[in-house]
Structure formats: structure tokens, C-alpha cells
Amino acid sequence: MTAPDVRPRWPQGREGCMALAFDLDGPTGDAMLNGTIWQKPEYFTFGGYGPFRALGRLLDMLEQYDVPATFFIPAWVVEQWPRQCAAIVEKGHEVAYHGYRHESFYTLSGDQQRQVMEKSRKIFWQHLGIRAGGFRTPSGDWHPETPGVLLEAGVTYSSSMRGDDRPYAISVPGYQQPLVEIPGKWEMDDYASLAYTREPDFPKGLDRSASYALTLDNWCREFDGAMDEGLCLTTLFHPKISGKPGRILLLEQFLAHMKQRDVWFARCQEVADWYLQEQQHD
């Protein structure tokens, strides 16, 4: 007996979906939340390099290869670098929520999460004129109340969990429309292979950067495996990590490899909208 085909029916009959995504964290995160970053100018500039210097390089690359992307941005970064963040929208890419200062949502109560989302919504509207429809949880996990908080804030999709290789629905009591999840995987996080800081030790235990050639090979294998099965792949790349001169060449090679296949390159919001439409038809 043949197993049922679980491949999604991608637009235009494409063989798979690639939702390229970047987390424009800047210097936000644990060191900012606990205050130690203000005693570590080097670490602050390590993060600030992302929106200040690397972002423009990435936008030029995406334009060259004609690939859309989604940028998940802590609202504090939008406040500090509004012109750079506005350039993302002007270039036709998507911007989405990523906390205010990259808070760990699994440590916050429902009310605290609502405060973060409301602040983020106001800042995105004030500086970008955008009501974002997407969210990626900082820290890679969330509180049981988070899906409801997101729907309450007008969010239609998340790219936070790891439960599938395809978009799926998260039903929330009291809401007719589910929250769409576009799952990622740590293998497609550039921190896992390319991040390095001496102090603070982050990621902990990582004492050197991986070979660029091996990193590219890993990414290409993950992409090819996903496309061979007709799945959806997204990335957790960071401009401050991958947007440096030597590493942008790595990303260019990855984009060139992906462009060889007949896949749907989509913003995450487009993937979520497609999923909701397909779900209505099934």
C-alpha cells in the first residue's frame, strides 16, 4: 500500500517553498534586559552592526537575486534605527514583530506579553506605518497564553516552533481563525555555526566559527532535502552574523544554489495567507 502524499500544493505547482527570514536583533537580548550590555560597549557594537552596517549589504544582495524576505525586528531596534528599518519596507520585504527588547516570552505572564505586543504595535505604526501580521518569539519558546495574545494583537502567523516541516494551524479557544505556524529549525540558524563573541560567552560553549564551506554544505543539504519532499523551509539568519563581507559571499552562494530549483520564494505572511486559503478549500 502506498503512503498518502502529504506534500502541500504550492502556488503555480512549485516543488517547495522557501521563506527566507532574518532576525534583526541589533544589540537587544539578555545582556540588554539584565543591564550588563551598558558596561560592555564591544558587545553593544557587535549587535548594532546588524542594522547600522550589515542590513544595507543584505538588502542589496536580495535585490540582486530578486528574492523576498521577512525581517523579524525587536521594536527597540525600530526606534533606534528607523531609517534602516524603513528601507526594508521600501525594498518590498516584510517586517514582523520580535518583542520589544528580545524578551523571553516563556518567562512573561499573559499581561506582560500584551504590554510588549502593544508597545511593539505602536512603534511599528509610528515609525514604519505598518501593522505587522507576523511574529517570531525571541528565545525560541513561548508561554501557553502566547498564541491567544498574538491573535488578540492582530497577528495571523508565528514562526517560532519546531513541530513540522510544513505550515500548520494552532487553534486558540475563542478565536475562529487559527494562528498559522511556519516552523523553523536550529540547523538553519546562523548562530549555530557562525556566531562568536569572547564575552559574554554566547552561544555558550562555542569557541570558534565553523568552516564556511561546511556551513554552506549544511544549508544546501537542508534546503535540497526539504524541496525534494515538497516542504517549506525558513531561516533564522541574523544580519549581525551573516551580513559581514566574507559571510555575505556565503549567503550569495546559498541563494544561487536555491535559485536553481523551481521553488516558491515567499514572505512569511504570503505563506500564512496561502495556508489559510488552502485550509478553507480542504
Task: Name each model feature, range by range.
Residues 1-134, 139-187, 213-235, 243-282:
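Catalytic alpha-helical scaffold of carbohydrate-active enzymes acting on polysaccharides/glycoconjugates
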Residues 132, 198-211, 239-240:
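Surface-exposed cleft-lining segments at the edges of enzyme active sites
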Residues 181-206:
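Glycine-rich, positively charged active-site loop/lid region within alpha/beta enzyme cores that binds
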